[in-house]
Design a protein with these regions (language model features):
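Mature, Sec-exported extracytoplasmic domains of Gram-positive
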Residues: 21-217
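C-terminal motif of bacterial Sec signal peptides marking the signal peptidase cleavage site
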Residues: 15-19
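Sec-dependent signal peptide recognition
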Residues: 2-10
């Protein structure tokens, strides 16, 4: 009888340990984050260094206006861009939102991203970096990150694309270090064919070869 009782006690302990181990495995890779959006932005800036690319803090009007976010659903936010945004598309928008608003926020950031991508395609400005944008949703944290050092614009598309991908991988590494994962949810729309066939640049001369002065030139 004692042997049977001892056996069942040992079996119970083994099953308990197995259950605890399974629970630990379930939580593996999940990181509880309590940082504000600004603290996350500061971490990205520190870790990425020259690959951060942003030097201007955006205003709340920009968050609610251009991006269309409902600020009543946003607990904390941080947004930065590059002061020379005409040729440097670096952008970082990070928000911590209330329960149930994360996917709505991600949709709005995706819409804003598509406008940036359209501009980059039209003028062929910083295109490879924009194509490597990251849209992260981790719980109630949502971020659109278009980051990376400036590549050589005179290099081939393949070289620029490789460089941009390497820079984006640095962003993934920092984000993964904070949240435990870095799953990119960005959607890259196909080109609509509206850009010209001159490598993305406008031809400033008309069909008759008339070199009229360009406004502002």
């Amino acid at each position: 009888m004692k042997r049977i009782l001892t056996f069942f006690l040992a079996l119970t302990m083994v099953l308990s340990l197995a259950a605890c181990g399974g629970k630990a495995d379930d939580n593996k890779g999940k990181t509880e984050v309590t940082m504000t959006a600004q603290e996350i932005m500061d971490t990205l800036k520190e870790k990425l260094g020259d690959s951060f690319g942003c030097d201007v803090a955006e205003t709340e009007d920009n968050i609610g206006g251009y991006w269309g976010l409902d600020m009543g659903q946003v607990e904390s936010w941080a947004s930065m861009s590059n002061s020379n945004s005409a040729v440097n598309s670096s952008y970082a928008v990070i928000v911590k939102v209330r329960d149930g608003y994360a996917q709505d926020a991600a949709t709005l950031l995706q819409t804003g991203y598509e406008q940036i991508l359209s501009y980059s395609r039209m003028y062929n400005m910083d295109l490879q970096k924009v194509l490597q944008a990251r849209l992260f949703v981790n719980g109630n944290y949502v971020a659109l990150l278009i980051l990376g050092a400036q590549g050589d614009w005179e290099a081939s598309d393949e070289v620029q694309a490789k460089f941009a991908a390497e820079e984006a991988a640095k962003v993934d590494e920092v984000w993964r270090g904070i949240f435990g994962s870095a799953d990119n949810g960005i959607t890259i729309p196909e080109e609509d064919g509206s850009s010209n066939n001159n490598g993305g640049f406008f031809d400033m001369t008309d069909d008759e070869g008339n070199n009229d002065p360009v406004l502002g030139g």
